[in-house]
């Protein structure tokens, strides 16, 4: 009992440590009074379509120097981010209201596009000093926080749409304190430490907050066209009357203006992301973890009782008998002892099993390392795309582990290393091939919609080059190491003639599929938060909780697979290899079913067949990765359990 308590205290400590250690993820910038700062704009996004589009696909004001794209990493490109410069200029600690531009009369295509983006709830995502714009809204007396602001709005009981053309910005600044320790991170500008000389020069203000209030204001277009960009205009209050708002219709000219207010804040630069990463539902996370711990300890208790009282008792009784008595006992008794000559017989499709286990080891390693680094703060949300980039890099370099695990299992099953090169190539191509097919199909859908989420052809070639130059050689090298590693020797000999398996009243696969409910019970609450982050545009930064859930999932998968394997051996079913894999891997089936449930009941606003196909495609890819990872955990645990179990049996 004391051991259980210590484990629980350790998990609490790890969670608090992971949540407390935070790296903001970018250089600290200080600005002097009057310094110009230009906002950037990311792709337009919507929770209704999940199809990102370029900001300048709509008739917005363009900067005087022209549109310039920011350098993007691999993760940003895959996520569909397209960060451009914008015309919105801010001057440090200068409160002002400025004119931007007036469009030409809207044509039919522009009106149709603006109305469509408005009704599909598209959001404009603006960034200042690497901080997304925050918007606060009240619903039923509760203040709700959003990132970005809508393209426009459609009043109820009206066929008209109105565009957001006036923005009221509030920029929170903190006076630079030279004695505050800076934090290293990885933002878009790179990585570095502020030197003492730079500290003395960097007298000024840090931007620690960026808020926006969107408005729709009807202007006299003829009068406003006489102004130039950044000319001052009177400050306005957001009108509530529709006749004072800017309607979207043909031949209308839309004037864009904005105003900015700088406000001093006590928030310091290392804490400026706290407003975005407020932990919601912490009690729900802890309830999920405690519930999972109860399941784990209950299941572990059953496992230990079975093994200590049944397995050890049988082994002790078996070893105390002489050879004649053992032979007589084998004829009289049934159970796992009777399959001693078949338990290590080569399974069907053994090559496919080795391939899936090899790739499963790689995916598991990638997930564990990524979540550990994220929990420690090395993959900050300030560094857009770094999480996905890190996962891809880890996957590529862990090819050496995949090749080693797959080939060593192949050598164990076959008794020879012959064919290891073909197996290593298959491991290198298996999951990337599945991902390539799914992403290519989805990419055609994105291309047909002119979405920025479509993967460019150049990126396809870059990914192919990374795979061929890093993943394939490392997988082959890992396979070579697997051929040189000491072979795992089976403790018993395999009979030439397979033993007949007794008929069962119900299919054994039914029990295997049902076993996935226990790992899913550990995972499903965290799945809700992850899905909400991906599909509803919310920040997910509770990696401390996710790390604990991952560790619990590993334990549950191992326990479930071992119990199912033992149950099959007890009924003289020696074909345990694939069943051990799918006993824990079947959790992927429930994850995919949950994703469909989430689509139907939580993403009711998702519209159009393209959006639904994108959602299902990405969910399917995630489920396959989960199946390979959890199946591998269960299989390897069962393999070592069976090896240990039968190594205790004395056989001539």
Curated annotation (Swiss-Prot):
Regions crossing the membrane: 287-307, 363-383, 387-407, 427-447, 461-481, 511-531, 542-562, 581-601, 614-634
UniProt entry keywords in alphabetical sequence: Endosome, Golgi apparatus, Membrane, Signal, Transmembrane, Transmembrane helix
KW 4Fe-4S (keyword) present: no
Coarse class of the protein's main subcellular location: membrane
Motif annotated as Endoplasmic reticulum export signal, chain positions: 641-646
Membrane topology term: Multi-pass membrane protein
UniProt cross-references to InterPro entries, sorted A to Z: EMP70
This protein's GO CC annotations: endosome; endosome membrane; Golgi apparatus; Golgi membrane; plant-type vacuole; plasmodesma; trans-Golgi network; vacuole
Top-level lineage group: Eukaryota
Record's signal peptide: 1-20
Residue ranges annotated as Cytoplasmic topological domain: 308-362, 408-426, 482-510, 563-580, 635-652
Compartment(s) where it occurs, according to its Swiss-Prot or TrEMBL record: Endosome membrane; Golgi apparatus membrane
Pfam families: EMP70
Motif (Golgi retention signal): 650-652
UniProt remark on domains: The C-terminal KXD/E motif functions as a Golgi retention signal, certainly through the binding to the COP1 coatomer.
Family: Belongs to the nonaspanin (TM9SF) (TC 9.A.2) family.
The name this protein goes by in its record: Transmembrane 9 superfamily member 12
Organism listed in the record: Arabidopsis thaliana
């Amino acid at each position: 009992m004391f051991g259980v308590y210590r484990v629980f205290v350790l998990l609490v400590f790890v969670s608090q440590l992971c949540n407390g250690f935070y790296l903001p993820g970018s250089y600290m910038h200080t600005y002097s009074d009057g310094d110009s700062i230009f906002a950037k704009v990311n792709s337009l996004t919507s929770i209704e379509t999940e199809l990102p589009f370029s900001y300048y696909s709509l008739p917005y004001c363009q900067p005087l120097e022209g549109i310039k794209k920011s350098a993007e990493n691999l993760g940003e490109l895959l996520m569909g981010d397209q960060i451009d410069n914008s015309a919105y200029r801010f001057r440090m600690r200068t409160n002002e209201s400025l004119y931007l531009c007036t469009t030409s009369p809207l044509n039919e295509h522009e009106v149709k596009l603006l109305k469509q983006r408005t009704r599909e709830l598209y959001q404009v995502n603006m960034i200042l000093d690497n901080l997304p714009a925050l918007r606060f809204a009240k619903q039923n007396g509760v203040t709700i926080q959003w990132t970005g602001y809508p393209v426009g709005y459609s009043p109820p009981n009206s066929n008209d749409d109105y565009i957001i053309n006036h923005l009221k910005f509030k920029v929170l600044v903190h006076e630079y304190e030279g004695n505050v320790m800076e934090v290293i991170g990885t933002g878009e500008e790179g990585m570095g430490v502020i030197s003492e000389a730079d500290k003395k020069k960097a007298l000024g203000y840090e931007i620690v907050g960026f808020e926006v209030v969107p408005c729709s204001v009807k202007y006299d277009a003829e009068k406003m066209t006489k102004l130039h960009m950044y000319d001052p205009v009177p400050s306005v209050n957001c009108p509530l009357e529709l006749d004072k708002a800017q309607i979207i219709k043909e031949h209308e000219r839309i004037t864009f203006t904005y105003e900015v207010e700088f406000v001093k804040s006590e928030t310091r630069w290392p804490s400026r992301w706290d407003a975005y990463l407020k932990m919601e539902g912490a009690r729900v996370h802890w309830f999920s973890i405690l519930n999972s711990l109860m399941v784990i300890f209950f299941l572990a208790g059953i496992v230990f009782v079975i093994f200590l009282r049944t397995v050890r008792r049988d082994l002790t009784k078996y070893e105390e008998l002489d050879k004649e008595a053992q032979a007589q006992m084998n004829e009289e008794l049934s159970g796992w002892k009777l399959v001693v000559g078949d338990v290590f017989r080569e399974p069907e499709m053994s090559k496919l099993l080795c391939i899936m286990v090899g790739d499963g080891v790689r995916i598991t390693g990638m997930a564990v390392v990524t979540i550990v680094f994220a929990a420690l703060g090395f993959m900050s949300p300030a560094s857009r795309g770094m999480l996905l980039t890190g996962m891809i890099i880890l996957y590529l370099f862990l090819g050496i582990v995949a090749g080693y695990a797959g080939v060593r299992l192949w050598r164990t099953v076959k008794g020879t290393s012959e064919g290891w090169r073909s197996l290593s190539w298959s491991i290198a191509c298996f999951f990337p091939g599945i991902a390539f097919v799914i992403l290519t199909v989805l990419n055609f859908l994105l291309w047909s919609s002119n979405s920025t989420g479509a993967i460019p052809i150049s990126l396809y070639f870059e990914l192919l080059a990374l795979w061929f130059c890093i993943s394939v050689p490392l997988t082959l090298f890992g396979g070579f190491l697997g051929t040189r590693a000491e072979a795992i020797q089976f403790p018993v000999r395999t009979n030439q003639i397979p033993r007949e398996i007794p008929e069962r009243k119900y299919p054994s696969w039914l029990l295997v599929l049902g076993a996935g409910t226990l790992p899913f019970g550990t995972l499903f609450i965290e799945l809700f938060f992850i899905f909400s982050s991906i599909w509803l545009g919310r920040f997910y930064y509770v990696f401390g909780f996710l790390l604990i859930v991952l560790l619990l999932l590993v334990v549950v998968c191992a326990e479930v697979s071992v119990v199912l394997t033992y149950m099959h051996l007890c009924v003289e079913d020696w074909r345990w290899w694939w069943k051990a894999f799918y006993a824990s891997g079947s959790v992927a089936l429930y994850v995919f079913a949950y994703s469909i449930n989430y689509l139907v009941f939580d993403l009711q606003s998702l519209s159009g067949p393209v959006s639904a196909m994108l959602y299902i495609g990405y969910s399917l890819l995630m489920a396959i990765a989960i199946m390979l990872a959890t199946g591998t955990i269960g299989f390897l645990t069962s393999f070592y359990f069976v090896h240990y179990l039968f190594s205790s049996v004395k056989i001539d």
